[in-house]
Amino acid sequence: MEYEVIIGLEVHVQLNTNSKIFSTATNEFGGSPNTHISPLCVALPGTLPVLNEVVLEKAVRAGVALGCEITKFTKFDRKNYFYPDLPKGYQISQFDKPYATKGGIHVLLKGEKEEKFIPLTRIHMEEDAGKLIHSHDPSINRSYVDYNRAGTPLIEIVSEPDLRSSDEAYVYLNELKTILRYIQVSDCNMEEGSLRCDANVSIRPKGEKGFRTRVEIKNLNSFKAVKQAIDYEVEWQKDVYSRGESFKQMTKLWDATLLKTIPMRSKEMSHDYRYFPEPDLPTIQISDSFIEDIRKTLPELPRQKKERYKTELGLPEYDAEVLTSEREIAEYFEEALVIAGDAKKTSNWVKDEILGIVNKENISIQEFAIDPVRIGKLVKLINSGEITGKIAKTIFEDMLTTKDQPETIVEKNGLKVVRDDKALEEIVIRVIESQPESVEGWKNGKDRVLGAIVGGVMKETKGKADPKLVNELILAKLGPLGEKKKV
């Protein structure tokens, strides 16, 4: 039987504010256990929450960027459950009045021409819980609680169950991460827990309406893990149905070592959490002017930027994709382009030479040794014909280890293109005379021999000869292809 895969994703994103969502405690990853805490973080009696306005601002910023409808009146609720990393015995979250609804993300699968729109159900704000640290010493059967993370501001972005494959889920997450980093509400660093994802997976026979029993998968600490877990779970559910059996709604953990999902508990429903309005926080009114002020500060988003690169700058799809993959890369490219004046040449240098080093050394483009202004000047020198592409790579190597401007390196090392017709003509004659077999090949109609002669001239001039002038001089000496002309 052929099945259709149904996937919905819940993505938790930590907001990059200076302080936590309801207290003045530092919002910072790492540090010694229980050092970034306040009395509220550990639920000391008498402490009361106060909403951090910057959290609301960044949350709305994310909602606007994702095309959501921002709720004019929103509130917080208590989500009641017991766990050692939740000292209050409840989490402050949002239940029936999330601050943002609808919206969505466009995804484009590799090899596809048409984008697919993945709608969102909602985005809500909530506080993060603490973290359990388990002893690795088998003789010490003990776990410790670090409350540094407790109270960290989160937004939970919930998609509609409209994803139909692990590939779609992977692309969706990448697009979401790119947007959130563009608008600078989070670094989305999965290794530090800034972005965490739960996947809800079910399958149904093709053509069947309605949804079957779903499984929620947790402990997905990379996009690769999300893809692997979904693929495994789909096959597991197919196997269950093929045997004529069924299963209960449940939560599973992804085991990255065994590469399988493992049952954790039966899946709770909303009534299990006994939600009720948070009595210590007032209803929040979000004005139209507040939303519009935020909308005006949004940068050009990656999808729009990519389209502009293709239509206005004439860049290929691949170039536009690479250059807009991170806001910092796009900014580097655009700053270099202002000086260089040639989009394609600038793109080639950024995506091939620069990102090649950035990826190899596992650094960010902000840490790259050469600033965009110097790269722009280098490309401009190539464009003006003052240096060749080959010489540019030599200059680039110097620029990696010095702060010198490219034009300074050119002058200091005498690297300008040779345009002296007489001097070049003498070199051309000398090279032609040293390659009688190439001359014979040309006379016999073999045009590929031209490259050997050009290469000889470039070698003699150490790559400094004007390639266009060299070609003209050689062709003038050789005559038309296939013609038995005396050279």
From Swiss-Prot:
Enzyme Commission designation: 6.3.5.-
One Gene Ontology term from the biological process aspect of the record: translation
Organism domain of life: Bacteria
Keyword ATP-binding: yes
UniProtKB keywords: ATP-binding, Ligase, Nucleotide-binding, Protein biosynthesis
UniProt-listed InterPro entries: Asn/Gln-tRNA_amidoTrfase_suB/E, Asn/Gln-tRNA_Trfase_suB/E_cat, Asn/Gln_amidotransferase, Asn/Gln_tRNA_amidoTrase-B-like, GatB, GatB_C_1, GatB_Yqey_C_2, Gln-tRNA_amidoTrfase_suB_CS
Keyword hit for Nucleotide-binding: yes
A molecular function (GO) term: asparaginyl-tRNA synthase (glutamine-hydrolyzing) activity
Catalysed reaction, written as an equation: L-glutamyl-tRNA(Gln) + L-glutamine + ATP + H2O = L-glutaminyl-tRNA(Gln) + L-glutamate + ADP + phosphate + H(+); L-aspartyl-tRNA(Asn) + L-glutamine + ATP + H2O = L-asparaginyl-tRNA(Asn) + L-glutamate + ADP + phosphate + 2 H(+)
SUBUNIT field: Heterotrimer of A, B and C subunits.
HAMAP family documented for this protein: GatB
Sequence similarity: Belongs to the GatB/GatE family. GatB subfamily.
Function: Allows the formation of correctly charged Asn-tRNA(Asn) or Gln-tRNA(Gln) through the transamidation of misacylated Asp-tRNA(Asn) or Glu-tRNA(Gln) in organisms which lack either or both of asparaginyl-tRNA or glutaminyl-tRNA synthetases. The reaction takes place in the presence of glutamine and ATP through an activated phospho-Asp-tRNA(Asn) or phospho-Glu-tRNA(Gln).
Protein name: Aspartyl/glutamyl-tRNA(Asn/Gln) amidotransferase subunit B
Lineage of source species: Bacteria, Pseudomonadati, Spirochaetota, Spirochaetia, Leptospirales
Gene giving rise to this polypeptide: gatB
